[in-house]
Structure formats: C-alpha cells, structure tokens
Amino acid sequence: SGQPVLRLEDVRRHIDQVDQKLLALLSERANLAHSVGEIKRAEGNEDAQFYRPEREAQVLRRIQSLNAGPLDDASVAWLFREIMSACLALEQPMRVAYLGPAGTFSQMAALRQFGHAAELVPCLSIAEVFRMVTSGSVSYGIAPVENSTEGGVSQTQEALLAHDLSICGEIALRIHHQLLSNASALGEVRRVYGHAQSLGQCRHWLDAHLPHAERVPVSSNGEGARLAAEAEDAVAIAPEVAAQLYQLQILAANIEDEAHNTTRFVVLGSQDAGASGADKTSLVVRSEERRVGKECRSRWA
C-alpha cells in the first residue's frame, strides 16, 4: 500500500508540539547560562566577563559542524547567535558602540556579532567608537578595518595605533550598495552622499550613470541616507535597511563595482580574548618617518 496522506492539521499539530519542546529547551539553556554567571560570582570575581568571544566562536563552529540541514549553516549560526545574545542579556546587558547613525553596515556587523539583545550605541565617528570602548562606556566596539575593493580603512588603522585595545573577533560582511533617494529618476540627481569608502567602491557605476552629480563624502552611509531624506535632488549610497529607516526608495540596486565586495570588521575590547582554536594575529606597523609615501602599515592575519 502507498504512504499515508499527510493532513495539514496533523502537520500543524506536530509543529506545535515541536515548538513546545523548543521553548522548554530554550528555557533550560537560559537557566544553564544563568548558572554559569552564578558560578563566576561565587568565585569572587564580580568583574567577570560573561561574554567570551572565543567560547561563542567554539559553540558556533560546533553547531555548524553538527548541522545536517535542511537549514544552511548561516541560518543555523544566526539562530544560535540570537539565542546566546538573549541568554547573555539576562546576566550582563551588553552595550556595543558602532559607527552610526542607524542604517550603516557597521550596525549590520554589530547585529551579526552580538544579536538583537545587545544595546547598540551609535557613534559619530570611528574615533568615537574607540574612545567609548577605552573609557569603559561600552563593553565592545565594532569598526571597519579593510575592504576587498578599497583596501584598509585609515581611520581604524590610526585609532588602533592610538588606543590600547584588543581585537576580540572579526566579521566579514558582503557589501551590497543601494542608491537611495526621494527622486524618481537618475536625471533629477545633483548630489551623491556616501562614505568615502563606499564612493570608491561604486566609482565606475557612478562614472557611467551619474557622471555630473557632485560626490559628497560623509561620516557614514547612514548619515548619507539621513541627508538624502531631506532633499529632492540627492541620493545616498547605503544598505537596503536604510531605505526602510529613512523612507527612501531604491533607485538602483547593488551598484558596487565588484560583485564579491566584502568588508572586514573587527570587534574591539579592553580585555584580551582567549584562544578559540581558530585564531588570527593582527599587527599594525607604522614607520617613524611620517613623510607622505613613507608611512607603512602592515597586517598579517
């Protein structure tokens, strides 16, 4: 005889049962995470770091190695990142500085690393991100350090030299630039707002489609979207999420010149991270001679 025919109500009932089990397991995990905090406090270390990036990296690698599908590894990692973020928030609310305002790629990187339970603190500049971490106003900071098209981010490199902070992790984020505007056609555009790195990553597209528009560098792509929202003849280069935040339409999608455009972000902290088993060492080196063309920065990772 053939296989029994599944009925929709039976499948939904089974889903409800699985959801109930998931909820019970999530509660059990949260209680275990709380126990970890209690053990650390019992050891007499009131300043214990509840967030351990090396431990989180180990957990995510293990989960992905066990994943048999049908969810892909990226989806599974995202789910468990959010679970860990929510559990951590029960013990130690996390404040994370990033280059703001809302709607930047730095914000996206922060969410990918720390999840939605963390309190994200927007900063006006990369230098301010470093100052916030150094002063202890936030637990961690996120800063872009290198782009596959434009190379190193000089503001981050300079700040790494100026501050005694540790790199505790990294996030590689695929960068897709959208052209956002109140204008209805490219012919109406007179100004293009964007971070200097983003303007460079879209240089050839802008040359071909907006050759006469003024290119205006701004502190972040989120700030560019905010400025474009106040004008009728301006566009901003920004991520898709900024279109929703600032109520702009997408005039053109994925305008980056390189299809595999990727930016590497670093997680900044005041304490060294432990070994995770898949670690990198980063160095920033500057020569004593400061003449143009003589400054040298090298990183090995």
Language-model-derived ranges and their functions:
Residues 1-298:
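Domain-level signature for soluble enzymes in the chorismate/prephenate branch of the shikimate pathway
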